[in-house]
Amino acid sequence: MSSRSVKSRKSTKSRRHHPYVKLTDKMFFSAISSKKELGTDFLREMDAPICTSKTILLPLDLNSISPGRCIYLSPFGHSSNMEFQCEKCTESKNKGSGDVSQNHDLYSVTLVFYKNVDKVVKHKAFYLSLLSHSMENLKKSFTQPELLYAYVVVKEAGHNVFPIFFEKDDCLSICLTFKCQTLHIGESCLRMLMDNLPNYKISIDYIKDVYAMTFTQCFAIQRNISIAEDTICESVSTLDCTDELREEIVKGINALQIKDI
């Protein structure tokens, strides 16, 4: 037997048993989004067109959406789209509205919490929805700054949302309800939430004629944040809860009881 054939078999055998690492979509897109030159090289080598739009189903775990994509929900179907091919994403960037990536304060959960936690009038709906359960829930929210962060980021993205709170596994969860027939969540908003809230499961569903984005804590992150809790609680207790706002809270709670979140 020739040495060449033996060498060939050894080479084939070594290739057959080479340990390959399974590359997930999330790992791949995270790599090319952080290293632009890698993404450019990959695009040059592609011999098949990019799928710019994908059909998605509700309920949807937002962690399943790859970086670079937005989501569009409507009565006629739901899709995940590449940002550069989405008219609404392009429009937001051109107008400078709804693109939260331009607001550098939003990159920090702690900074957003510090700057907004005492603005009880500005975030009246957030605090009165908490207070509708109990003062204890209001105080508990101070230990979960991610709740206020999620609310502020989605509002900054240009959405009119109403917050509903519920308890799960001794932690507070927040459900942001959107009263609209069609809903577009931009890529920058999705990335901001997913990158800065790794300890929360974020999902979206259609519940009782409203779209609902739910944030549920998976594990706690220790944050050393010192605030004037008593002063904030006193300010919240003096807020006027209108009949309209009270009705919003009741409707939201009833909707969540129908859907097992």
Curated annotation (Swiss-Prot):
Short name of any one Pfam family annotated for the protein: Herpes_UL31
Chief location of this protein within or outside the cell: host cell
- A biological process from GO: viral budding from nuclear membrane
> Where does each CCCH-type zinc finger lie?
70-184
Post-translational events: Phosphorylated at serine residues in the N-terminus. This phosphorylation regulates the localization within the inner nuclear membrane.
Location comes to: Host nucleus inner membrane
Organism superkingdom: Viruses
Give the UniProt entry's GO cellular component terms.
host cell nuclear inner membrane; membrane
Q: Which ranges does the record mark as transmembrane?
A: none
Is the Zinc keyword given for this protein?
yes
Q: Which InterPro entries does the record cross-reference, listed alphabetically?
A: Herpes_UL31
- Answer yes or no on keyword Cell cycle: no
User: What keyword terms does UniProt attach to this protein?
Assistant: Host membrane, Host nucleus, Membrane, Metal-binding, Phosphoprotein, Zinc, Zinc-finger
Q: Which residues form a coiled coil?
A: none
Q: Which GO-annotated molecular functions does the record name?
A: zinc ion binding
Free-text function comment from the UniProt entry: Plays an essential role in virion nuclear egress, the first step of virion release from infected cell. Within the host nucleus, NEC1 interacts with the newly formed capsid through the vertexes and directs it to the inner nuclear membrane by associating with NEC2. Induces the budding of the capsid at the inner nuclear membrane as well as its envelopment into the perinuclear space.
Q: What is stated as this protein's family in its record?
A: Belongs to the herpesviridae NEC1 protein family.
**Quaternary structure and partners:** Forms a heterohexameric complex with NEC2. Interacts with capsid vertex specific component 2/CVC2; this interaction directs the capsid to the host inner nuclear membrane to initiate budding.
Q: What is this protein called?
A: Nuclear egress protein 1
Organism for this UniProt entry: Saimiriine herpesvirus 2 (strain 11) (SaHV-2)
Taxonomic classification: Viruses, Duplodnaviria, Heunggongvirae, Peploviricota, Herviviricetes
